[in-house]
Amino acid sequence: MIDDILLEAEDKMDKAVEVARDELGAIRTGRANAALFQKILVDYYGAPTPLQQLAGITIPEARVILINPYDRGAASEIEKALRASDLGVNPSDDGNVIRIVLPQLTEERRREYVKLAKGKGEDARVSVRAVRRKAKDELDRIVRDGEAGEDEVARAEKELELATKSHVDAIDDLLSHKERELLEV
């Protein structure tokens, strides 16, 4: 029972780190990155469809992204979705591919993105700590109900603390890497 609680907590903490990785990857840096387009949905024949399912995304240069629609009929909808996104990009359709040239980030914009990244990192840390708190409450309940001894639960709580620390450290590493990437000119 204790092992189940620890495994479940570890699994949820892993998911929190993965969500943080995805969210930080979606924050624009000075370089082109296909992860920027993960959350863009295109209205394809009335159904919201992820951009990756409708087009191939290539990065031929550091600040240029080419989007090659599998169905040319979807090109105008893809372009519309890109303009409506919060990425601040200006796509141009040359008939074969949609080309996006990412403008150079200003210092002010870089600072805004760092602040956004820190917010997402803090959200991830909070969710890891919430998982820890829930698991600790479960362990306390087990002791109260007499289902396990205090020594076993104390050992499990130490393991839980180690898991929490390693996951928070992983989030901090992701965040510091993203900050370096954002502030690099």
Swiss-Prot record:
<comment type="similarity">
    <text>Belongs to the RRF family.</text>
</comment>
<dbReference type="InterPro" id="IPR002661">
    <property type="entry name" value="Ribosome_recyc_fac"/>
</dbReference>
<dbReference type="GO" id="GO:0006415">
    <property type="term" value="P:translational termination"/>
</dbReference>
<dbReference type="InterPro" id="IPR036191">
    <property type="entry name" value="RRF_sf"/>
</dbReference>
<dbReference type="InterPro" id="IPR023584">
    <property type="entry name" value="Ribosome_recyc_fac_dom"/>
</dbReference>
<dbReference type="GO" id="GO:0043023">
    <property type="term" value="F:ribosomal large subunit binding"/>
</dbReference>
<protein>
    <recommendedName>
        <fullName>Ribosome-recycling factor</fullName>
    </recommendedName>
</protein>
<keyword id="KW-0648">Protein biosynthesis</keyword>
<dbReference type="GO" id="GO:0005737">
    <property type="term" value="C:cytoplasm"/>
</dbReference>
<keyword id="KW-0963">Cytoplasm</keyword>
<comment type="function">
    <text>Responsible for the release of ribosomes from messenger RNA at the termination of protein biosynthesis. May increase the efficiency of translation by recycling ribosomes from one round of translation to another.</text>
</comment>
<dbReference type="Pfam" id="PF01765">
    <property type="entry name" value="RRF"/>
</dbReference>
